């Protein structure tokens, strides 16, 4: 159903733009970067690149066909601020990104353990989730060097389910 795809994928990805923009404005860098892990067909990475042209977005996916699709989208949409890498996130050299995002990628614990080394000092991991993932938060705190900094409710037009962003930072940072 095209209408449902619009809501579940495009509107859902658009709901990330304002919180991400706000967070990047607070970071002391002139060249903000985002790594979108498990990007699939480029959501939310392509949406972020369109809406935040001053930010470079790297979409990472383990499936080559999906990374190729993101590259094709970047060309068709003339987006100079996006790139795609076909790789498992844990195999890449540290990317030193301002934010590392995920949408439907993994548990918070797995996301932090696999992707945390790609966040520069002072940056954040940001996971899009449905309802507040209480059990995942417990595992995150118990088994990783990361802590939830905030859980931000998201409003997605036309979507009846709950959505939230889990903002994470390294333990011991403020």
Identify the meaning behind each predicted range.
Residues 54-174:
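S-adenosylmethionine
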Residues 1-3:
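Short linear capping/connector segments at secondary-structure termini
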Residues 34-35, 48, 57, 70:
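Hydrophobic packing within well-folded, soluble alpha/beta domains
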Residues 5-30:
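Conserved alpha-helix/loop element of class I SAM-dependent methyltransferases that forms part
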Residues 12-15, 39, 69:
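Hydrophobic side chains within alpha-helical segments
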Residues 41-54:
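Conserved SAM-binding loop of SAM-dependent methyltransferases across substrates and taxa
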Residues 28-40:
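Conserved class I S-adenosyl-L-methionine
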């Amino acid at each position: 159903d095209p209408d449902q795809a619009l809501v579940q994928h495009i509107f859902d990805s658009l709901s990330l733009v304002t919180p991400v923009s706000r967070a990047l404005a607070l970071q002391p860098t002139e060249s903000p970067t985002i790594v979108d892990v498990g990007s699939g067909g480029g959501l939310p990475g392509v949406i972020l690149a369109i809406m935040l042209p001053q930010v470079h977005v790297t979409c990472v996916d383990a499936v080559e066909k999906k990374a190729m699709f993101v590259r094709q989208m970047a060309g068709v949409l003339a987006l100079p601020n996006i790139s795609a890498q076909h790789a498992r996130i844990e195999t890449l050299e540290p990317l030193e990104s301002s934010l590392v995002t995920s949408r439907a990628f993994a548990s918070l614990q797995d996301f932090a353990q696999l992707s945390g080394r790609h966040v520069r000092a002072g940056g954040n991991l940001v996971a899009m989730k449905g309802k507040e993932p209480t059990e995942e938060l417990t595992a995150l705190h118990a088994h990783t060097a990361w802590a939830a900094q905030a859980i931000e409710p998201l409003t997605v037009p036309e979507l009846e389910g709950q959505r939230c962003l889990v903002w994470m930072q390294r333990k011991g940072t403020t």
